[in-house]
């Protein structure tokens, strides 16, 4: 019995599953584009190379922003939570971690019914006191979690170097 073995780098243009990894090219949690599900006429060509997924604009540019910053005087986290009301959000500190949780029950939007839930955890830097963490929600739906960084204890000073006449390392006694 003869079995045809195809080289994995050679794609047959009319084989419908010539690119099964296309769905795995996306970033986890990113939305699917129509081109991810259906082949275009150009993608059926054996010479077509799909552009890398990093060239696609991530969806958090318009929704789902999550950004952590370490500035000179403070630690801050900005999180887009515009789909949640303040009552549907919870921010808590557990040891050296800030945990943000949001959940809303099913409700109608322009596409149908939707329910959402998320959990985010951010490690608090060592120079931020967990008791000083605060949070606020802006009018455009961005949750900000802040904490001031501890300042160095005292001003910088130069320590003079003194010279000693005796050696720091002496010879070990011989046996």
From Swiss-Prot:
Pfam families: Crystallin (PF00525), HSP20 (PF00011)
Main location: cytoplasm
GO cellular component, one term: plasma membrane
Tissue specificity: Lens as well as other tissues.
Residues bearing attached sugar chains per UniProt: 170
Location of N-acetylmethionine modifications: 1
GO terms (BP aspect): apoptotic process involved in morphogenesis; cellular response to gamma radiation; lens development in camera-type eye; muscle organ development; negative regulation of amyloid fibril formation; negative regulation of apoptotic process; negative regulation of DNA-templated transcription; negative regulation of gene expression
Region feature (Disordered): 145-175
Modified residues annotated as N6-acetyllysine in this record: 92, 166
The keyword Zinc is assigned to this record: yes
Annotated keywords: Acetylation, Chaperone, Cytoplasm, Eye lens protein, Glycoprotein, Lysosome, Metal-binding, Methylation, Nucleus, Phosphoprotein, Secreted, Zinc
Localization per record: Cytoplasm; Nucleus; Secreted; Lysosome
Molecular function GO labels: amyloid-beta binding; metal ion binding; protein homodimerization activity; protein-containing complex binding; structural constituent of eye lens; unfolded protein binding
Residues the record lists as binding Zn(2+) 2: 104, 106
sHSP domain segment(s): 56-164
Annotated positions binding Zn(2+) 1: 83, 111, 119
Residues with the Phosphoserine modification: 19, 45, 59
Assembly and interaction partners: Heteromer composed of three CRYAA and one CRYAB subunits. Aggregates with homologous proteins, including the small heat shock protein HSPB1, to form large heteromeric complexes. Inter-subunit bridging via zinc ions enhances stability, which is crucial as there is no protein turn over in the lens. Interacts with HSPBAP1 and TTN/titin. Interacts with TMEM109; in the cellular response to DNA damage. Interacts with DES; binds rapidly during early stages of DES filament assembly and a reduced binding seen in the later stages.
Reported function: May contribute to the transparency and refractive index of the lens. Has chaperone-like activity, preventing aggregation of various proteins under a wide range of stress conditions. In lens epithelial cells, stabilizes the ATP6V1A protein, preventing its degradation by the proteasome.
Protein family membership: Belongs to the small heat shock protein (HSP20) family.
Protein name: Alpha-crystallin B chain
Primary gene name: CRYAB
């Amino acid at each position: 019995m003869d079995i045809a073995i195809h080289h994995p780098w050679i794609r047959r243009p009319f084989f419908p599953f010539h690119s099964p990894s296309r769905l795995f090219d996306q970033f986890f949690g990113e939305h699917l584009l129509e081109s991810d599900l259906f082949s275009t006429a150009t993608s059926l060509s054996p010479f077509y190379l799909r552009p890398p997924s990093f060239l696609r604009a991530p969806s958090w540019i318009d929704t789902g922003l999550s950004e952590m910053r370490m500035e000179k005087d403070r630690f801050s986290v900005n999180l887009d939570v515009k789909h949640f009301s303040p009552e549907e959000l919870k921010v808590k500190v557990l040891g050296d971690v800030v945990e943000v949780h949001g959940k809303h029950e099913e409700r109608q939007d322009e596409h149908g019914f939707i329910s959402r839930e998320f959990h985010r955890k951010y490690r608090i830097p060592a120079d931020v006191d967990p008791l000083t963490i605060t949070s606020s929600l802006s009018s455009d739906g961005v949750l900000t979690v802040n904490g001031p960084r501890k300042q160095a204890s005292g001003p910088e000073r130069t320590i003079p170097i003194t010279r000693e006449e005796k050696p720091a390392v002496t010879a070990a006694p011989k046996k």
